Regions:
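C-terminal regulatory domains involved in ligand/effector binding and gene-expression control
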Residues: 1-74, 195, 200-206
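Signal for well-folded cores of large energy- and translation-related assemblies
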Residues: 44, 84-89, 115, 119-126, ...
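A common structural junction motif
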Residues: 47-50, 155-160, 187-195
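Positively charged, aromatic-enriched nucleic acid-contacting surfaces
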Residues: 62, 72-89, 162-166
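Active-site beta-strand/loop microenvironment that shapes enzyme catalytic pockets
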Residues: 79-124
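Short glycine-/aliphatic-rich beta-strand segments at the starts of folded cytosolic domains
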Residues: 126-142, 170-172
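Short amphipathic alpha-helix segments
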Residues: 139-157
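Terminal, non-globular segments
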Residues: 172, 178-181
Length: 206
């Protein structure tokens, strides 16, 4: 899994004009293909008179898709995907809509124009960094609970959820590189009485 990725904190726009053709880019955070597809259809509906609306989306689960939407192959969808990848963006969808200005741009001109509009939008999106964290469930007696928060904090971790009943149940996260040290320490301190299970990892906002 990726150690981190960037994703837009908010929708953002970019626009350029090249030989009377207008290129309007929009980037938005998305969590899954359903959100990405809905966003793309929303943009196409908004710009129904435009000649082309190309797009790219990348998801942290590995799903990805792009389209040139009728432009020459390799001049639109692939270049904006490459820009997103080089800038470490994920969980986002990016569209670039073209209103044709009557002058052909050629493959090189199209590639430069779509790339410039996409970059313009990306630069306005106020990205947030999402970092991979290990996640665990803990169960312990109350006598051991008071030690856990300070040890977690020492290793860059935090409590995500807690339940206090006959025993204490916690969901915690911490950087993967500190997970073994943390668990070796609490195992030693509790004499093996803190029960731990590894859960699916997650990404947390920096």
């Amino acid at each position: 899994m990726k150690e981190f990725f960037l994703t837009p904190q908010k929708p953002a726009f970019g626009e350029i004009t090249e030989k009377r053709s207008k290129f309007i880019a929009e980037i938005r955070p998305v969590c899954d293909e359903k959100e990405a597809t809905a966003f793309i259809e929303e943009v196409r509906s908004k710009h129904r008179d435009a000649r082309h609306t190309v797009f790219s989306y990348l998801l942290i689960d590995g799903k990805r898709r792009y389209s040139d939407d009728g432009e020459p192959s390799g001049t639109a969808g692939a270049p904006i995907t490459e820009i997103l990848e080089k800038k470490d963006f994920c969980n986002c969808a990016l569209t670039v809509t073209r209103y044709f200005g009557g002058i052909l741009l050629g493959t090189g001109g199209l590639l430069r124009a779509y790339s410039a509009a996409a970059t313009n939008a990306i630069e306005q999106c106020d990205p947030v960094k999402m970092t991979l964290k290990s996640r665990f469930s803990l169960r312990c007696e109350y006598t051991f609970y008071n030690r856990i928060p300070s040890i977690l904090s020492k290793y860059g971790g935090k409590i995500l959820d807690s339940d206090f009943s006959n025993t204490v149940s916690l969901s915690v996260s911490l950087p993967p590189e500190h997970a073994k040290t943390f668990f070796d320490l609490i195992f030693e301190l509790s004499g093996g009485k803190i029960l731990a299970n590894q859960l699916d990892p997650l990404y947390e906002k920096e």
